[in-house]
Amino acid sequence: CIGLFNDEYEPRAFGDNFQKLGTSTILIEAGGFKADPEKQEIRKFYFAAMLRGINSIATKSYLQKNTSHYFDIPKNNKQIFHILIHGLVVDGIKASIGINYDEYPTHDGMGTEKIYSIQDIGDLSFCDAYQTFSSENFSLNGEIIFNQNANFELSDKHKMILCFQNGQLL
């Protein structure tokens, strides 16, 4: 699925600051694939895109390309979460929750750990996720707090589905 992102200047964006200083840049940005948390598949696409780009620059074939088709790409309007849970009752209201993780280096520096946090609560029927859970029978033990580390257990008819403790998925 391809979506066109907003191209306004973002002061926190690495490449935008190089462009601001007058350096030409090529932006290659992508999400990931389901069941590919290490992003090995997407790296293949990055590599192929860089090869095609270098070839296009070397042969000047980019001069013959019609760039108007670029703006035919639909605008990205979907929120994609790592985990999306539908069918919860939160504070007496039926809702969905969207959960994302950030990766941090482990203490030994040899790997990373994922810390999950609640990124959205409400009607998320328009959203997608790498993992989606949906049931009318979910029970929740713990609290759902927006923008805080996930810290709850999710069960479906006494079967444990997910368990988070201080942001870590157990």
Residue ranges of predicted features:
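C-terminal accessory segments enriched in acidic
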Residues: 1-170
